[in-house]
Swiss-Prot record:
CDD domains: MFS_MdtH_MDR_like. It comes from Klebsiella pneumoniae (strain 342). The keyword Cell membrane applies. It is found in: Cell inner membrane. The gene is mdtH. NCBIfam families: PRK11646.1. GO terms for cellular component: plasma membrane. It holds the Pfam family MFS_1. The chain crosses the membrane at residues 13-33, 34-54, 99-116, 139-159, 165-185, 214-234, 243-263, 277-297, 300-320, 340-360, 368-388. One of its GO terms (molecular function) is transmembrane transporter activity. This is Multidrug resistance protein MdtH.
Length: 402
């Protein structure tokens, strides 16, 4: 085995260990924020939605800058610093008794993610060959699902005693992850050339095909982020206990671990990436529409199953398509900008979803936020259909980079 092949192989194992630590640290805390502050402390869902939206907007909206800086200085210092900042955000969240404290803790957590997320994504593109990326992204998603369940179980158990224990566990995991990266991550450069920050930013912004694709995904993310806000609230409302939320993540893990990789392998040989993305989005949209009209936990979990199936169809295709459109001369910048759709969609999905949830309850129409999300899903589907139409593809606008 050549040194390059050996480095790629070891690098992939490193990425899997690193990803598991990050997922565990995240899911110990974030799925329980809405339970803690809406159900236990009686805050309006809008207040918590703003906090979650701020984290999403800061982390993903500023990701292009984090990626551009990583292109210039390398991945390691950005990743280690960002993970320590995320740990600090969790520590601040532990003492949040006013909305503004929660907002500040989420902003700090988001700033940490701004630093570590784009270079981590760029390392995947650097270390995994193009023909292997779809399968590797599927493995990461399976790991995400398993980590989400383990993290949510640990967080739910700790929440019985004290929310400060939940935040302490999340902070400890991110400190451990920072130490792991500081000790084992080589001083790899992300791009094929040492790109100045301004040049990397400009290269992305001039790439119309990539910008169009990223911004179109805003609507997709508005649906996807509800697994952190409205779906846990719905499960808690119908079940009458926050402990039921862990079963939502258990469903996700079961579906991902049993179906994600086989579906990805089967579909990558038969369908284009954009068609898989659109099919998954359509399934997610159809699952969202009737959620507000459900009255039993069995009905809700059935729709959540359908939503997760749509997600495992769409996510590997979305990640692979975004990576294939990136320019190797500015990988960090491209991966940072690719998070902008998540920034806008997350902020709108959290804050708008929280506001619609409160409004629907106030006027006696709990189905209102879900119908609106369904409409957004259909609009996004049509936008992707237009963007990837044969005529536009033939023009070369959306042909993947080699």
């Amino acid at each position: 085995m050549s040194r390059v092949s050996q480095a790629r192989s070891l690098g992939k194992y490193f990425l899997l260990v690193d990803n598991m630590l990050v997922v565990l640290g995240f899911f110990v805390v974030f799925p329980l924020i809405s339970i803690r502050f809406v159900d236990q402390m009686g805050w309006a869902a809008l207040m918590v939605g703003i906090a979650l939206g701020l984290r999403q907007l800061v982390q993903q909206g500023l990701g292009i800058f984090g990626g551009a800086i990583a292109d210039r200085f390398g991945a390691k210092p950005m990743i280690v610093t960002g993970m320590l900042m995320r740990a600090g955000g969790f520590a601040a969240m532990a003492v949040a008794h006013e909305p503004w404290v929660l907002w500040l803790s989420c902003i700090l957590s988001g700033l940490g993610g701004t630093l570590f997320d784009p270079p981590r994504a760029a390392l995947v593109v650097k270390l995994v060959r193009p023909h292997q990326r779809g399968r590797f992204f599927s493995l990461l998603m399976m790991q995400d699902s398993a980590g989400a369940v383990i993290g949510a179980l640990l967080g739910s158990w700790l929440l019985q005693y004290d929310f400060r224990l939940v935040c302490s566990a999340g902070a400890a995991l991110f400190i451990a992850c920072a130490a792991f990266n500081a000790w084992y991550l080589p001083a790899w450069k992300l791009s094929t050339v040492k790109t100045p920050v301004r040049e990397g930013l400009g290269r992305v912004l001039r790439d119309k095909r990539f910008v169009t694709y990223v911004l179109t995904l805003t609507g997709y993310y508005m649906l996807a982020v509800q697994v952190m806000l409205m779906l846990p609230i719905m499960v808690n409302d119908i079940a009458g206990s926050p402990a039921a939320v862990k079963w939502m993540y258990a469903i996700e893990a079961t579906i991902s671990l049993t179906l994600l990789y086989p579906i990805a392998r089967w579909s990558e040989k038969r369908y284009r990436l954009e068609h898989r993305l659109m099919a998954g989005l359509l399934v997610m949209t159809l699952a969202m529409l009737p959620i507000g009209m459900t009255s039993s936990l069995q009905q809700l979990f059935t729709l959540i199953c359908l939503f997760y199936i749509g997600s495992i169809i769409a996510e590997p295709a979305r990640e692979t398509l975004g990576a294939s459109l990136a320019d190797a001369r500015a990988r960090g910048s491209y991966m940072g900008f690719s998070r902008l759709g998540l920034a806008f969609g997350g902020a709108l999905g959290y804050a708008g979803g929280g506001w619609l949830f409160d409004a629907g309850k106030a006027v006696g129409q709990p189905e209102l936020p879900w119908l609106m999300l369904g409409a957004i899903g259909f609009i996004t589907f049509l936008a992707l259909w237009w963007q990837f139409s044969p005529k536009r593809s033939a023009s070369g606008m959306l042909e993947p980079r080699t």
